[in-house]
Amino acid sequence: MLDALSKAAQLQRQAAAKGFDWPELDGVWAKVREELNELEQAGDDTAARYEELGDLLFAIVNLARHLKVEPTDAMIAANAKFERRFAYVEDAMAAACKTLCAENLAAMDAAWDQAKAEERERA
């Protein structure tokens, strides 16, 4: 059984093979923006948010396909990046004798930005 991202990519490849696809990348980007806007417009309607978030994720997977990026691999990499950066935040907060809580969000954000900067320097 395929994970949801892989299933979405498979469905989109099958549709594209039958000609149901955006001919230009601009159309894919426009669809992503459209779905994001619809999610924003869903407001407090839980059912609408659920549906529109699914549509946005589906559109993002289609964008990944057009960009020739495997969405599951990209998500795995994003998860790993988040884990590295959040571990940095935790260490920085501990070194500063600060707790991880909403009241210290500015300090956590600063540590996050530092983690990003250090990753860029190493790249």
Language-model segments: what does each one mean?
Residues 1-53, 57-123:
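Flexible "arm" and connector segments at domain edges
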